[in-house]
Amino acid sequence: MFSILKLKSLSISHRLRGLLLLAMLTFMSATGAAESVRPFTLGSLAQVLDARAGKPFILVFWSLDCQYCPTELKMLSELKRSHPALDIVLIATDSVSDTPQLISRAESYGMNNVEQWVFAEDMPERLRFEIDRRWYGEVPRTYFYDQKHQRESKTGLINKKFFEDWLARNAVSSPGR
């Protein structure tokens, strides 16, 4: 009888270790994924701008629910492939709890190699106010920053010609030029 109880407890012990290992691997995977999308809080815009001092870049606000975002993000992915020096920053207006879906969606659009952030404030209105007092949360919302960080904003789907003209004006060339 003792050996049967010992065998049952050993079996339970093995199961618990297996579950613990699975939980640890899941946590490590989620932690690694979460590191690729940073929390966007008050002051984060200043970090984005400071990291790009004197350099042109495109800042894109998007959401998982956005009807036009897939089209714009796919177009930006194509432009990034043809202009590797193009600096794009994605900021999702969703919540931090959506991070796994944001990573997956960005990857599906070919945007997994760009800097990504997600709104991480209880009151997103405060973030929008800090970003642009005239912005009320509609997406996609795209800001085109030149070398002096003068910006031009566009709401909605932007045509490829506008992007290409901006790239030419801001000397973001493609390989071989």
PLM feature spans:
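Bacterial N-terminal signal peptides that target proteins for export
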Residues: 2-20
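Bacterial N-terminal signal peptides
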Residues: 17-29
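N-terminal "domain-start" segment that seeds a small globular fold
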Residues: 30-49, 113
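Short active-site neighborhood of thiol/selenol oxidoreductases, capturing the structured segment around
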Residues: 51-67
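The canonical Cys-X-X-Cys-His
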Residues: 66-69, 142
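Structural microenvironment flanking redox-active thiols in thiol-disulfide oxidoreductases
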Residues: 71-109, 124-127
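Short, internal strand/loop/helix patches
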Residues: 106-139
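Thiol-/selenol-based redox modules, centered on thioredoxin-like
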Residues: 139-177
